[in-house]
Design a protein with these regions (language model features):
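ATP-dependent carboxylate/acyl-activation modules
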Residues: 114, 120, 318-322, 444-452
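Active-site beta-alpha connecting loops in nucleotide-dependent enzymes
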Residues: 48-51, 317, 336-410
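N-terminal leader/targeting and accessory segments in enzymes
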Residues: 1-95, 256, 354, 382-383, ...
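Short beta-strands and strand-loop turn motifs
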Residues: 71, 109-115, 188-194, 226, ...
């Protein structure tokens, strides 16, 4: 199987122009950051909102890149560097997608694509851990799941036997683009919630956008869905076109979590009352996430023992229910990468099942909710009260709705702040040994500053 890409291939794929260099040169590793260039990388100059990376092609060549793919930039003087190459294209973002698709089509391997309103990155991490027990597997790094990050993941394919990619979206058409590049053999949809509802208008529209992942699914491909999600359950019951495998806790499904227990070490359950699964994170959300990995593992012929081992040993990506023990004796649950109602609910569920001292929730604004912002922040407040949070601290304008709803539902110890620094001062004063602290908000709230302060 020839998986190599040459300069000539790139020119043909992108309709680009070779400014200078050898068209037979092999292009193996790609980078978009001149500060992270390794010897013989191919630098791709991407155009951002403020600048065009193509202008820094010389820096890339000096750093060791063997060639560059750049945009047509008005007034840019292209200097000839012996032994290097320069390809000029109309749009480097579009080009990197085209090259990634070309690369993907050279591989006849399982490609698992994951999308959903919440739990994508964690589910990807668990599935990767399970599939890796049998196959040499590549996965999306962190959450590089958009029209730039995902193509760069595909371009990292080497001698891999399986690929696990995460696909994110906040508008129609985005998953359609990604799935037609990745061409998955297995599509996993974790749930349809309220993330990006401000952009898409309704949960039904979110479902429609998530189902775009099926447009690139290979002909004999399989769809794996959370059968307890109301919209996915309805879609599945009406589906007669795709091969579907279901998982769940409540609705009858192909793979069900039964005899669920929450222990000091995490979560434990049996699959259809048979093999036991241990998840090193507490909470119902991770029972669901790990069940999807059971489905994928079974489909790819991973043994029961290796499925259980992969789930028990998986490692979470940064800032996703990352449980850290402080030197001062309290525990911090760092889940501050992003937030929507469904992920807030899952995080609070995890907090409620932790054993120790007081349960403190530090919650901030959730973005991209549009006209649903007030309602969904209030719902989070209600959940915080129902999950018996001992102390609630909110930061931000929208998060005041969380505080008000929590108070209305019986939670007494509540502190609201407009500024992070004021919240941090308060937190430091009230924290005690054995406390368990959840830190969660949308990424733009910069809640990682709270975690650093703790």
């Amino acid at each position: 199987m020839n998986t190599q890409i040459t300069v000539k291939d790139i020119i043909d794929i992108t309709m680009g122009k070779l400014i200078y260099g050898d068209e037979n040169e092999i292009c193996e590793n790609f980078s978009r950051n001149t500060k992270e260039i390794n010897q013989d990388d191919i630098f791709v100059g991407l155009k951002g909102d403020k600048f065009d990376g193509s202008k820094f092609y010389e820096d890339a060549l000096k750093a060791g890149a063997k060639g560059c793919i750049i945009n047509k930039v008005e007034g840019l003087e292209i200097k000839h560097v012996p032994g290097k190459f320069i390809i000029q294209v109309e749009d480097t973002v579009k080009a990197i997608g085209q090259i990634a698709k070309f690369k993907r089509e050279k591989y006849h391997i399982p490609v698992i694509a994951i999308t959903g309103s919440v739990g994508k990155t964690s589910t990807k991490d668990i599935i990767y851990s399970v599939v890796s027990q049998k196959y040499h597997t590549l996965k999306t790094q962190g959450n590089l799941n958009n029209h730039i990050g995902m193509p760069f993941t595909l371009l990292r394919l080497k001698d891999h036997e399986a690929l696990v990619v995460e696909m994110g979206m906040n508008h129609f058409g985005e998953l359609s683009y990604l799935t037609n590049i990745a061409q998955p053999t297995i599509a996993v949809i974790t749930n349809v919630g309220t993330a990006h509802i401000g952009n898409l208008g309704s949960r039904e529209n979110i479902l429609k956008a998530k189902l775009e992942i099926l447009e690139g699914l290979q002909k004999e491909g399989t769809v794996i869905i959370n059968n307890d999600n109301d919209l996915l359950h309805k879609w599945q019951s009406e589906n007669d076109h795709y091969k579907v495998i279901t998982y769940g806790i409540e609705n009858p499904s192909n793979y069900m979590a039964t005899e669920i227990e929450y222990t000091e070490a995490g979560s434990k359950y049996k699959v259809n009352h048979n093999e036991e699964i241990e998840v090193p994170v507490k909470g119902e959300a991770f029972v669901y996430n790990s069940l999807s990995a059971v489905c994928v593992g079974k489909l790819l012929g991973v043994s029961e023992q290796d499925i259980a081992k992969g789930i028990k040993e998986f490692e979470l990506s940064a800032m996703r229910l990352d449980i850290q023990k402080s030197e001062y004796g309290y525990t911090v649950i760092n889940d501050c990468y992003n937030a929507n109602y469904d992920s807030m609910k899952a995080a609070l569920d995890c907090l409620s099942k932790m054993q120790g001292g007081r349960k403190i929730a530090i919650l901030g604004d959730m973005g991209e909710l549009g006209e649903y912002a007030t309602e969904l922040h209030q719902k989070v407040g209600k959940v915080a009260a129902e999950d018996n949070v001992d102390i609630l601290i909110t930061v931000g304008t929208e998060a005041k709705q969380i505080a008000e709803a929590a108070k209305a539902n019986g939670l007494e110890k509540i502190y609201s702040f407009d500024e992070l620094k004021d919240a941090i001062d308060k937190i430091k004063k009230i924290l005690a040994v054995n406390d368990i602290v959840l830190v969660k908000a949308s990424h733009y709230m910069n809640f990682e500053e709270i975690v650093k302060a703790l």
